[in-house]
Amino acid sequence: MGPRYGGAPALLLPLLLLLQVSSGLCQEPEPCRPGFGADSYTFTVPRRHLERGRVLGRVSFEGCTGLPRTAYVSDDTRFKVGTDGVITVKRPLQLHKPEISFLVHAWDSSRRKLSTRVRLKAATHHHHHHHDAPSKTQTEVLTFPSSQHGLRRQKRDWVIPPISCPENEKGPFPKNLVQIKSNRDKEIKVFYSITGQGADAPPVGVFIIERETGWLKVTEPLDREQIAKYILYSHAVSSNGNAVEDPMEIVITVTDQNDNKPEFTQAVFQGSVTEGALPGTSVMQVTATDADDDVNTYNAAIAYSILTQDPLLPSSMMFTINKDTGVISVLTTGLDREGVPMYTLVVQAADLQGEGLTTTATAVITVTDINDNPPIFNPTTYQGRVPENKANVEIAVLKVTDADVPDTPAWRAVYTILNNNNDQFVVTTDPVTNDGILKTTKGLDFEDKQQYVLYVTVVNVTPFEVILSTSTATVTVDVEDVNEAPIFIPCPKVVSIPEDFGVGQEITSYTAEDPDTYMEQRITYRIWRDAAGWLEVNPESGAIFTRAELDREDFEHVKNSTYEALIIAIDNGSPVATGTGTLLLVLSDVNDNGPIPEPRNMDFCQKNPQPHVINIIDPDLPPNTSPFTAELTHGASVNWTIEYNDPARESLILKPKKTLELGDYKINLKLTDNQNKDQVTTLDVFVCDCEGVVNSCKRTAPYAEAGLQVPAILGILGGILALLILILLLLLFVRRRRVVKEPLLPPEDDTRDNVYYYDEEGGGEEDQDFDLSQLHRGLDARPEVTRNDVAPTLLSVPQYRPRPANPDEIGNFIDENLKAADTDPTAPPYDSLLVFDYEGSGSEAASLSSLNSSESDQDQDYDYLNEWGNRFKKLADMYGGGEDD
């Protein structure tokens, strides 16, 4: 055989193969053809109920745009197609037919629309699909894909189908799943191993493989709710450890068993429905979930049902529930909140579409109120009284009853006045009692109408759900007459007069009318406000007179040539009512003011003085103002000159004619207005020692012009102040030297039996500060008292204790000296002339012994004492009757 293929023919075969490959490589690529990968796609779904978000399948499209993604549009809004071609369910739906179809559209690079049809088929339901799968009659073997060039990665398109393993199997374990073989196991000894989740990654050891035979086994029961899919990698190596095959991916899917019952999302569901709801009205929805597989099995296909209803009124089946969605709706009519306000339902959820595991929950349905009961007045007639001219006065409280639920729109009352043409009344609703409060919105006029009859209806905030009649109440309102204030007509009253209107003249008559036509009342008038004091009013007639001169230029009281005064009118009703009227006097201008310059004080520099602008002001109105005429008078034109600054002659320019001496200058300026009203004004101008514009100017004091300097003035003032201080000190010294003389005799109105004078009528001495020097002087410096009718007896003089230095010993001092005085042998008897130790020093009055009118011992006549009054009656009795004895 070898020689047969030798030589030239043998070399020609590789050349032909090379040419064939080269020709294939040189061929131009086929043009891109846009379109879907198939004309139609069919996807099988395991159940008729499809939840939101479920993935149905995938379509492919080549748009020849070079973009990795494509925009798809489904003509069935229940499905959504993503840019990757994956079709998902947009909202929950139920397949009522075994098969449905729809179109999916896409556009190519030329904006041409292309379509494909997608069909959905429901899988056939087997009642015992949840039981364990029957044992296989033939062993399943997985073989590594063949490789022509040794070890290389397997093709991306080559996928090993997943291996199914039921959950919750009973064993025995380990249990064979599948046998893995290599195509080279007949050539060399191959050893097998696995890696991945469940093998060498947590949970470790769930799956094992026999090293030599390649049997993949499960070692324990699986739980789909924990891990639904395992991904393992099988490896084949030779005895020396070299890889014989590329690693192969093995997917183990845990098939579901119905081992979880449904669970409601809530133990108690709350819902509500209005009374009188029609059958088919949706009330609420209950939901339950199931942890089992809801894609490939019916273990999580939940069906809902109602087990019980409480109460069974008015029917035992008032509600129904959708088996698939759990929506509870009204089944029959007859819902009445006033009869049954609440229903309690026990609902059940069962998987396997109602044939499997079950659970229950409670649904509480509240029957809400509707406006099927009208508000009714009770009573229907009312009477009220209101004084006239008063707004927002409560007239009556309208009572209503309503059988609907309180504090709801079906209970809240709304009142309407049928014959309220002028909107004089309003009815508001009390938020607590629901009563209607009838009030006035504006003042009523008794003279216009004395009684009103109102018709009031009542409804609710929400309209009636059924045809109902409305309730009506009748309210009679009587208007009470009250004393109303007089009304000035017109108000305000405008009167135009000249400002030089004569004093005492009548300006106008401003009177008021009494609206109380049924009362004959007398009205008097007074001035209420007259800020300038220009007016007076006749209290009976209301005539307005001037009592002072008017002045339009009194800008404090006159605004825009108008003077405002308030006049009041007072009636004699009970109570007294007062009305106010406004009188506006428009004062026309009179040329009674001469023009004046502004400013009047100015400073000029002596050198190169800057002229000053003087504005001319006239408070009068045109034509009594500009143009003005200016003139310098009293010799002011010798040093100064003026000229007009503007054509209207409303300002002047003042400047000196020559260089002036420093000092004050008085300039007399005569200004005349357009109507020849003139006025002379003196300008005070000071010439400063400066040049050009005056920045600062020091004015010389008046005394400086008299030749007196500031130091001299201060010296004179200081001398006067020193002289005043010296005189004040002398006066204080003289007052301190003056001795206060004590009175010798008591006051004339003090009559006593002896000559002792204590200056007190009882109660003790208030002043406890004793003048101890007087006591000492009274004992040691007694005055000399001589008698000329008795020869003195020479006796020893008692020794008196000197005044102590310590004031605390004053008591002992007085007691000892008193005892010495009592034992004094020189003391005269009580019936003779007493010699007092002390009667006051420096007294200008003589001693009592000076009463003798003669130096002889002859008897004296004392009868004249009786003529001296009661003060000398005691002396007259003592001396006047001596001869009778």
UniProtKB/Swiss-Prot annotation:
Main location: other
Marked site: Cleavage: 753-754
Post-translational modification: During apoptosis or with calcium influx, cleaved by a membrane-bound metalloproteinase (ADAM10), PS1/gamma-secretase and caspase-3. Processing by the metalloproteinase, induced by calcium influx, causes disruption of cell-cell adhesion and the subsequent release of beta-catenin into the cytoplasm. The residual membrane-tethered cleavage product is rapidly degraded via an intracellular proteolytic pathway. Cleavage by caspase-3 releases the cytoplasmic tail resulting in disintegration of the actin microfilament system.
Topology, Cytoplasmic side: 734-885
GO CC field: adherens junction; apical junction complex; catenin complex; cell-cell junction; cytoplasm; desmosome; endosome; flotillin complex
Domain spans labelled Cadherin: 158-264, 265-377, 378-488, 489-597, 607-688
CDD domains per UniProt: CA_like, Cadherin_repeat
Glycosylation positions in this chain: 282, 287, 360, 472, 474, 511, 560, 578, 580, 582, 639
Record field: compositional bias (Basic residues): 121-131
A Gene Ontology molecular function term of the record: beta-catenin binding
Modification Phosphoserine, positions: 773, 796, 841, 843, 849
Residues engaged in binding Ca(2+) 2: 259
Coiled-coil spans in chain: none
Required for binding alpha, beta and gamma catenins, as annotated region: 814-885
Domain of life: Eukaryota
Domain notes: Three calcium ions are usually bound at the interface of each cadherin domain and strengthen the connections, imparting a strong curvature to the full-length ectodomain.
Physiological role: Cadherins are calcium-dependent cell adhesion proteins. They preferentially interact with themselves in a homophilic manner in connecting cells; cadherins may thus contribute to the sorting of heterogeneous cell types. CDH1 is involved in mechanisms regulating cell-cell adhesions, mobility and proliferation of epithelial cells. Promotes organization of radial actin fiber structure and cellular response to contractile forces, via its interaction with AMOTL2 which facilitates anchoring of radial actin fibers to CDH1 junction complexes at the cell membrane.
Protein name: Cadherin-1
UniProt organism field: Canis lupus familiaris (Dog)
